[in-house]
Each structure stands twice: as structure tokens, then as C-alpha cells.
Amino acid sequence: MRKNKYSNIESIIKIAKKGGMYILVDDENRENEGDIVFCASDVSPKKINFMAKNGRGLICLTLNNNQAKKLTLNYMSPVNQSRNQTAFTVSIEAKKGISTGISAKDRSRTIKIATKKNVKKNEIVSPGHVFPIIAKDGGVLVRAGHTEASIDIAKLSKKIPAAVICEIMNEDGTMSKGDDLFKFANTHKLKIAKIDDLIAYRFKKEKLVKLKKKSSIHVKG
């Protein structure tokens, strides 16, 4: 039996690059919850069905501000009073190529359309069965949420800045935390990483980039 051990961010990036799923856990003093995550560019009916069947939480599409503007998405509420200021927009659906919109196939298509680089706003309608969330510019260095973390991983994996996330619930309807999360991860052979580690990873990497840029500047005497 595997020990309850968090994976490093490098291993999560490798999984994301290969189109795989993984779990991100936020701080104990925040939601203290785990989300199943994969890059939106790798969406498939199979992955959506896995989330719906095993994750049991709300399946959401995380987007950056730029993509949300292309879709002219309005916030779900003009005044965000949610505890963690999660930036939900109106729900969406692909205008064409779907049936009722709720099937794994339909939701997968909606996500594919909504994350196209050249998407037109009339390709998406509201309301629908996919729930977009807009990430803060600056990612986890600005807001340590699953929304920002999922997009940061996508960007670090050299993929479009969008992801699909779903909270993990236990069979009894309670939120999966701690040992329950590791049990879930072990059962489904998924790796778990902490958002706190992603924050540290970004600080370290971006500091090194700045130092390299600084050292490349030659001052003439």
C-alpha cells in the first residue's frame, strides 16, 4: 500500500503534458479540499464521465480573463459575496453539435468550443451545463485557489491557459479531505500535489529567471 505522500510540482507538470489527470489540494485554512484537474485542451467524454462518476462535485471550466472576454461572459452575480470570492460566470453550452447539454459528450464539446483560440461569442449560449470560473491574473501568486492553480499548471505544461476541475466528494456526500483524498488517489492511481508547493515552485522559478536576465545585462564602463 502506498504511503500518503504529496507529489512534487515537476511530476504534476509531466502528467499534465501527457494529458493526464491529477489532484490539487488547497491550504488547510482555506477550503482544505481536493479537486480532480486536467488541462482543457485534453478534454474528452471519458474524462468528464470520470469526474461526474467518481469526483461527484461540480464540474467547472477555468478560464483566464482574455478567453472570458472573447466569450463575453458575465459574472453569475454582480456582487461576489462567496467566502473565497470564486469568480463564477453564467453557465454555458455549445450552440451547435449537442443534444441536451448534460451528457459527458456534450459537456466535452462545450469545453472544446469555449477554449478555442479563435472562438466567436455566438458559438456559446447561456444558460448551460458547464460552469466557467475566471482566474485572477497572476495565478496562485495572487490567489491560492484551485482555479488559478489549474491554469498555472496548464501554462507550465505549455498548453492553453484553461482547465477542467471537479471537487472530490465521499460516497456519503461529505467533502473528501486528508486520508480520504489519498485513499481516492490510490484507488484511481492519481497523484496529489499541494497548491502551496505550486506557489513555492513559481516563486523559485520566476526568481531564477529574473536573476538570469539581470546577469545577462552588461554595463559598459
Question: Positions of the model-derived regions?
Answer:
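Catalytic domains of riboflavin
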Residues: 1-221
